[in-house]
Design a protein with these regions (language model features):
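Glycine- and other small-residue-rich loops at beta-strand/loop junctions that grip anionic moieties
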Residues: 64, 186-190, 210, 243, ...
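A general structural motif
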Residues: 164-170, 176, 188-192
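Adenosine-phosphate binding glycine-rich loop
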Residues: 212-275
Length: 275
């Protein structure tokens, strides 16, 4: 009877762990999963799983105490480097020092689950729609931001993982709590929309920000942002002309050239045309 009660508690803890993992995947959050894979006869716990976030918060357990603290530390390091693996822990010496009955050794496998890179598509036009489709194929989470009536862009909204309706770019993108290191592509319905989006994005610590437009448009937008107090260093972050020069003309070709540039920045390889 007692064994059944303990089994029920174990089942509930694993259900909670699975729910937490699903939530992390939905919210696109980095985490690691630590699983006991081997122990000796002196270890108090012979099985267990623990989910660890990059800030050290944990769900589940691999035994508690100093050993669990060490596992959490190693899991956080694994998230930071992107490399998990098999970790071995020997608690016999510490148990002897502290006069504990339980020591033993344990092997824990730590798996890293990295969040997907985030593409924020500001503009749901023809190029934006093509970009969203292509970026999804290369593993991006897609966030769409647009100021047009939702009925006009319903198909683009449905294709995105998340949609941010825009009335004021600075306020709405700020309230959206977008992750640092996101990739922004600005292809709004007009110059004013792109200027407002760029003004909001430059303070968001982007990994990449590119804007569609010819030289007159870019010059006019940069002059206005200079007048608003944005520095040349901030404006130098902007990839424009956007994308690789492949002689692109159609929305599909333009999207391919932009995504190629985004991937070069993400993977730290290649050379964009504005260098």
């Amino acid at each position: 009877m007692a064994d059944n009660r303990w089994q029920g508690m174990e089942d509930l803890s694993y259900v909670r762990l699975l729910e937490e993992q699903l939530c992390a995947h939905r919210e696109n959050v980095n985490y690691a999963l630590a699983t006991i894979v081997d122990t000796d006869q002196n270890t108090a716990r012979t099985q267990g799983k623990m989910m660890v976030y990059e800030n050290g918060a944990a769900v589940g357990t691999v035994g508690g105490g100093a050993l669990e603290t060490k596992v959490i530390h190693d899991a956080c390091q694994a998230i930071s480097t992107g490399r998990g693996g098999l970790f071995h822990y020997n608690m016999n010496s510490q148990a002897a020092r502290e006069g504990l009955a339980c020591g033993g050794s344990m092997s824990v496998f730590i798996e890293v689950y990295a969040s997907r890179p985030v593409l924020v598509m500001c503009g749901a036009g023809h190029v934006g729609g093509c970009m969203m489709r292509l970026a999804r194929l290369t593993g991006f989470q897609i966030i769409l931001a647009d100021e047009r009536p939702e009925a006009l862009i319903a198909d683009k909204i449905n294709a995105a993982d998340r949609y941010i309706p825009i009335k004021n770019y600075e306020e709405d993108l700020g309230k959206a709590r977008l992750p640092q290191g996101a990739f922004y592509v600005l292809a709004g319905p007009n110059h004013d929309a792109d200027r407002k989006a760029l003004a909001a994005v430059l303070n968001a610590s982007p990994a990449y920000v590119g804007m569609i437009g010819g030289k007159p448009k870019i010059t006019a937008i940069f002059e206005k942002l200079h007048a608003m107090g944005y520095s040349q260093e901030q404006l130098d972050q902007v990839y424009t002309p956007i994308g690789l020069d492949v002689g692109n003309e159609t929305p599909e070709e333009i999207a391919v050239s932009i995504l190629a540039e985004v991937l070069m920045v993400k993977n730290k390889k290649g050379r964009p045309q504005n260098v």
